[in-house]
Amino acid sequence: AAAGNNGPKENTVTIPGISRKVLTVGSSDDDTYDRGRKVLKTGYSGRGPTACCIVKPEILAPGTGITSCSKDKSGYQVKSGTSMAAPVVSGALALAFEKYPSFTPAEMKLRLYERAYPRSAQLGRIGWGMIHVDHLVR
């Protein structure tokens, strides 16, 4: 689930990301610019821990300046936010499960954490770090 865009203060992860049962994804790159003008405030990604002291988000992924779908004629537009970061992790996990089909979800989650670029100084606020897809699927 996406962490939400209400950061950077602690305890700003939104529902459903606060649930113990979901993997919550934050955006690693918080500044968004359009024609040189900042359009999203610095630190928009929701941060943990939750009110129950759960580390959230667990993992970070790129979420700024992502080409996505649009209702316009072109069919595409550039978007930013944790909702753009979450599909990066979903896709990476799909590749990893394809390579390691015998892994349980818990085993894959641990592999994801162990192979992330660490940012341990802020573990409770931003999780285990930035996703490293290459290391995840090796």
Positions of PLM-derived features:
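Active-site neighborhood of phospho(di)ester-bond hydrolases with catalytic His/Asp-centered motifs
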Residues: A1-G4, V25
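Extracellular S/T/G-rich loop segment that most often corresponds to the catalytic His/Ser-adjacent loop
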Residues: G17-E98, S102, H135-L136
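Extracytoplasmic/secreted cell-surface and envelope-processing proteins
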Residues: P8-T12, D34-R35, C69, A121-Q122
